Design a protein with these regions (language model features):
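Bulky hydrophobic segments
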Residues: 20-25
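Sec-dependent N-terminal signal peptides
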Residues: 2-13
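Boundary at the C-terminal end of the N-terminal hydrophobic targeting segment
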Residues: 15-18
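Hydrophobic alpha-helical membrane segments
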Residues: 26-209
Length: 209
C-alpha cells in the first residue's frame, strides 16, 4: 500500500508546487490521467536537475525530458515511452550533422535543434519506405534507421537495445527476477522505440535530393 501511496503523494506535491519547469504543466494538466502522471513524474524530477546545469543541457527543442512528457500525455504511457526512447537514441553526438543534412530548423536564441513530437508533413519527399524501415528494425533493431540514411543513429539504437537486453538475460539467468524484469522492460521500450524511430526517420528525416 505504501508503494502505491508514495508516487501519488509525490505527484500531488509537484502538481501543487510552483510550476517552473515544462513537464510541470503537463503533470498538472487535467487531460493527463494518473498512469500518465506516474510516468511523467520522473521526467519532472529530472528537469529540476538538468535545467539547472549547463552540462546536462539538451541539444534539442523541446528538450528530451519535455518531449517525453508531451509524448506520454498525447499517446499514453506505453507508446509515449517508446516515442521518448526514439528521441533519446537520436540525442547523440551525430544529431547536429544529421540536422544540417535535412536542413532542419533551429530554435532562437539558443540555436537548439527543433524537433517536435508531432510532425504534420515531411520537409522533403522521401524515396525510403517508412513501412520497410519499421519492418527492418522489427527484425534487427537499428537496421531501419540505417536503411533510412542514418547509419550512426542505427548503431546507437542497436546498442540501446542490446545493452539492457544483455543485462536482462544475465539477471534472469542468475535468478534475479526483479532486476531481470526491470531490464527486460527497458529493452522492450527501446525495441518499440527503434520500430517507431525507423518509420519516423524514413518518412520525416530526409534531406533534399
Amino acid at each position: 500500500m505504501l508503494k502505491i501511496l508514495i508516487p501519488i503523494f509525490l505527484i500531488t506535491g509537484l502538481v501543487y508546487s510552483q510550476q517552473n519547469y515544462p513537464a510541470d504543466t503537463v503533470l498538472a494538466s487535467l487531460q493527463t490521467n494518473i498512469f500518465e502522471k506516474t510516468v511523467i513524474l520522473p521526467i519532472a524530477t529530472w528537469q529540476r536537475i538538468s535545467y539547472n546545469s549547463e552540462l546536462l543541457a539538451c541539444q534539442f527543442y523541446p528538450s528530451c525530458s519535455n518531449y517525453g512528457a508531451l509524448a506520454v500525455r498525447n499517446y499514453g504511457p506505453i507508446i509515449g515511452t517508446a516515442i521518448t526512447a526514439d528521441r533519446i537514441v537520436r540525442c547523440n553526438p551525430f544529431a547536429l550533422n544529421y540536422h544540417y543534412e535535412m536542413h532542419g530548423e533551429f530554435h532562437y536564441p539558443d540555436y537548439r535543434l527543433v524537433d517536435s513530437v508531432q510532425v504534420s508533413r515531411p520537409r522533403y519527399t522521401s524515396n525510403k519506405s517508412p513501412v520497410l524501415a519499421a519492418g527492418l528494425s522489427t527484425i534487427m533493431p537499428g537496421t531501419g534507421r540505417m536503411y533510412a540514411g542514418r547509419f550512426l543513429d542505427g548503431l546507437m539504437g542497436l546498442w540501446m537495445v542490446l545493452l539492457p537486453g544483455t543485462a536482462a538475460y544475465g539477471s534472469l539467468k542468475d535468478g534475479k527476477s526483479i532486476k531481470g524484469n526491470f531490464f527486460a522492460g527497458i529493452t522492450l521500450i527501446f525495441y518499440l522505440g527503434e520500430i517507431y524511430g525507423a518509420y519516423r526517420t524514413a518518412k520525416y528525416y530526409q534531406g533534399p535530393k
